[in-house]
């Protein structure tokens, strides 16, 4: 089974994340940040990854530490659940519309972490959530999941729609890239015979 649980505790946050890559998209996100929970719910639903996130953070300071640390823990959980990545599809490209917004997400589950993130938010906040934290979350996730990730909003006018298209695009890209490819017969999808090195 491709599952993992990661616990992360610092002076700023106390987080537990569980993933099942072969789930049905069931989400149970409780971070204390309503908009962020909504994004995590979308991520689970559209990736078909079962996801449980329990986070207690220093929200009296701001949402930064909780958002970033959930990205770290979720990335680590996905990486651990993938194991040696044998048999996965590895690559995926998604164009994700959300009303007037269109975002392109391209992923390589390579073991080599990298992020390109290009999205301009017309507002500084979505409710009480700082829009700059969207990039912070993607950075933390990509670096800890060990994926090369390109996220680019091609156009959009509504900050909520832009954020949602980024998370949904990642979800659909993850869904395709971590899927088992029956044609590879359990081989690691690399001419080197391994990923991440």
Swiss-Prot record:
A GO molecular function held by the record: imidazoleglycerol-phosphate dehydratase activity
EC numbers, comma separated: 4.2.1.19
Species this chain originates from: Rhodopseudomonas palustris (strain TIE-1)
PROSITE patterns in UniProt: IGP_DEHYDRATASE_1, IGP_DEHYDRATASE_2
Pathway the protein acts in: Amino-acid biosynthesis; L-histidine biosynthesis; L-histidine from 5-phospho-alpha-D-ribose 1-diphosphate: step 6/9
Family to which this protein belongs: Belongs to the imidazoleglycerol-phosphate dehydratase family.
The protein, known as: Imidazoleglycerol-phosphate dehydratase
Keyword entries, A-Z: Amino-acid biosynthesis, Cytoplasm, Histidine biosynthesis, Lyase
GO CC list: cytoplasm
């Amino acid at each position: 089974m491709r599952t993992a649980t990661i616990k992360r505790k610092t002076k700023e946050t106390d987080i537990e994340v569980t993933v099942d890559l072969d789930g049905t998209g069931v989400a149970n996100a409780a971070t204390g940040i309503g908009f962020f929970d909504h994004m995590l719910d979308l991520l689970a639903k559209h990736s078909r990854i079962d996801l449980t996130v329990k986070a207690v953070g220093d929200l009296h300071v701001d949402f930064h530490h909780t958002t970033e640390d959930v990205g770290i823990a979720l990335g680590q959980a996905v990486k651990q659940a993938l194991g040696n990545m044998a048999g996965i599809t590895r690559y995926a490209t998604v164009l994700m519309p959300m009303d007037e917004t269109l975002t392109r997400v391209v992923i390589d589950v390579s073991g080599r972490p990298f992020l390109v993130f290009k999205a301009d938010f017309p507002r500084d906040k979505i409710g009480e959530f700082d829009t700059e934290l969207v990039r912070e979350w993607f950075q933390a996730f990509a670096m800890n999941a060990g994926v090369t990730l390109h996220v680019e909003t091609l156009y959009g006018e509504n900050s909520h729609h832009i954020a949602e298209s980024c998370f949904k695009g990642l979800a659909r890209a993850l869904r395709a890239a971590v899927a088992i490819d029956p044609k590879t017969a359990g081989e690691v999808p690399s001419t080197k015979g391994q990923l991440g090195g």
